[in-house]
């Protein structure tokens, strides 16, 4: 039937019902081809992924609030197309932090947070997936890294607790997360945390995947 009423995002922002947002497009590829003509393998190439990480860790200081000083910066989410892609980004980011790639964490960033970015990854791990064993093995390493960073003790048997802890560190609603040692800067996801997640300190959603459904983006 005919539309009875329409309430747009623009009107909701004006009414203060939702927060405003700004979309920035960044091109990490130099090519004359249209996006549809670029093979998916290009987006899985390490050089491309390094450009994306450089855009996040060194060229987004203002969006992440580095001008506010130690312990007052915002955090962010990076969403990618698949679990293997998320795992690849996580592993590559560890190498960037270790100084093993051409992309380095800039001195301007280190002056504020020498340990930036403190990152983790979250995705569903099930027994029924064909590549479940690989996903579980990778998640075990993620948990080891996380436990070492934050002095926690999560295991594969307590992924629910791990995910809750990640959510809390992103939201920073508890006083203890006001201290830098307890803060998380970046979480890499596929579909998690994209809808219905309230995190006042989360300023930026980095999207490295094909266009998402509008309802997912707006939420």
Regions found by a protein language model. Give the residues of each.
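Conserved C-terminal RecA-like helicase domain
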Residues: 40-189
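Signature of the SF2 helicase/ATPase Hel1-core->accessory helical subdomain module
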Residues: 1-40, 49, 194-219
């Amino acid at each position: 039937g005919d539309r009875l009423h329409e309430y747009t995002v623009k009107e909701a922002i004006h009414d203060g019902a939702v927060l405003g947002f700004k979309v920035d497009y960044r091109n990490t590829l130099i090519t004359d081809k249209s996006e549809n003509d670029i093979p998916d393998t290009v987006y899985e190439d390490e050089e491309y992924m390094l450009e994306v990480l450089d855009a996040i860790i060194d060229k987004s200081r203002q969006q992440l609030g580095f001008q506010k000083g130690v312990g007052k910066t915002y955090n962010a989410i990076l969403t990618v197309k698949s679990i293997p892609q998320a795992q690849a980004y996580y592993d590559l980011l560890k190498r960037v932090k270790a100084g093993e790639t051409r992309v380095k964490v800039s001195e301007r960033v280190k002056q504020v947070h020498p340990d930036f970015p403190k990152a983790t990854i979250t995705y569903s791990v099930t027994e029924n997936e064909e590549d479940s064993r690989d996903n579980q093995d990778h998640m075990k390493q993620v948990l080891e890294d996380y436990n070492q960073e934050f002095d926690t003790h999560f295991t594969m048997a307590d992924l629910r607790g791990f995910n809750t802890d990640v959510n809390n560190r992103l939201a920073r609603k508890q006083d203890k997360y006001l201290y830098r040692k307890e803060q998380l800067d970046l979480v890499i996801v596929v579909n998690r945390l994209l809808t219905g997640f309230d995190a006042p300190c989360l300023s930026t959603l980095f999207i490295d995947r094909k266009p998402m459904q509008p309802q997912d983006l707006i939420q």
